[in-house]
Amino acid sequence: MDKTVKLVFQDGLEIEGKSFGAYTSAAGEVVFNTALVGYNESLTDPSYKGQIMVMTAPMIGNYGVPDDKAMINEIEAWMESNQIQVTGLVVSYYADDYSHWNAIQKLGAWLESQNIPGIYGVDTRMITKKLREQGSTLGKIVADTDVAYYDPNEDNLVDQVSCKEVIRYNEGADIKIVLIDCGVKNNIIRCFVNRDVEVIRVPWDYDYSTLEYDGLFISNGPGDPALCIPTINNIKESLKADKPIFGICLGNQLVSLAAGASTFKLKYGHRSHNQPVQLVGTKRCFITSQNHGFAVDDSKLPEGFKTFFTNLNDGTCEGIRHESKPIFTVQFHPEAMGGPVDTEYLFDEFIEEVKKYKNANA
């Protein structure tokens, strides 16, 4: 019989459930994700670093977990990073039995192998309503030993998830992109490599000014963007030039801060595969995959920048664009994984801008 554990919130609420995964205690920021599928991608997304993820889908684990060591083009084939990034997992019903052609193990066994606790048999609907009404809060999964509450937003999480040295993918390709790794998802790299781009992946605080490249990309990542001061300073220098710049999620926030805008923490964030965004100036709507707890205040955008996309649920900024330079960023995830790929065309737009720049400066 599975052991009993508790989900404890900072306000004192305790919810009892059953343990799966590692029988251990862990603390972090409690957030909810409304995606129906894609838990292996979500669990390995570096943007979830330091967070306890509540899945609102009623059954989790029924299609198991694929091989997390399988590699394609030197990138994990089925995961978004090389390890589970969440601090803990909360589900309503955990399916220990699984069935999928690509699965090799149970979700619980995978969590246990990386010492990540899970709790099931709890009312995730009630928990989600609590987070929606009160906002994301600190919490902990308590097993045999209690632990202190932990606020991940006080730490520089980007430093923890970024690569430690320069890594190159698809070397020799004609187009070269510097990718600032703030916790990049693997599918972003795949999207570039699949378009025959050489990706030069650099650490979050790396001085890339000495490298030869044609365009700059700033990745997604966890935590408060204001803590990434070296990255912001490097981007400030890049904004002075004319090379194309593209940012996703945290990258959107960092480019905005470098340009002189500000960011703020959302009440409970956007974490789902069904966030509607509108292309500003049109009636065009896209359904997007999102995972972020901070947003850009587009009421104070600096001169030369304008809002690119807007969230149709709460009206928040979903991207910015420069009026004359090839610079644009989005808060959502056009690479998806999981989620819809309706906006993956943005990679093509960026590469076209890079080609124009490269040809003009040949």
Language-model segment annotations:
Residues 284-325, 361-362:
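Catalytic beta-strand/loop cores that center a nucleophilic Ser/Cys/Thr
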Residues 117, 176, 244-246, 262, ...:
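Proline-centered loop/turn at the N-terminus of a beta-strand
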Residues 176-178, 182-247, 254:
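Phosphate-binding active sites in nucleotide-utilizing proteins
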Residues 171-177, 282-285, 322-327:
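Beta-strand-turn-beta hairpins that frame and shape the catalytic cleft
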Residues 1-205, 225, 337, 349-362:
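RNA-binding accessory domains that recognize and position tRNA/RNA substrates
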Residues 220-287, 293-295, 339-358:
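Cysteine-nucleophile active-site neighborhood
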Residues 123, 249, 292, 333:
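Active-site glycine-centered loops adjacent to acidic/histidine catalytic or metal-binding residues
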Residues 176-181, 288-289, 328-332:
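Active-site-proximal beta-strand elements of phosphoester/diester hydrolases
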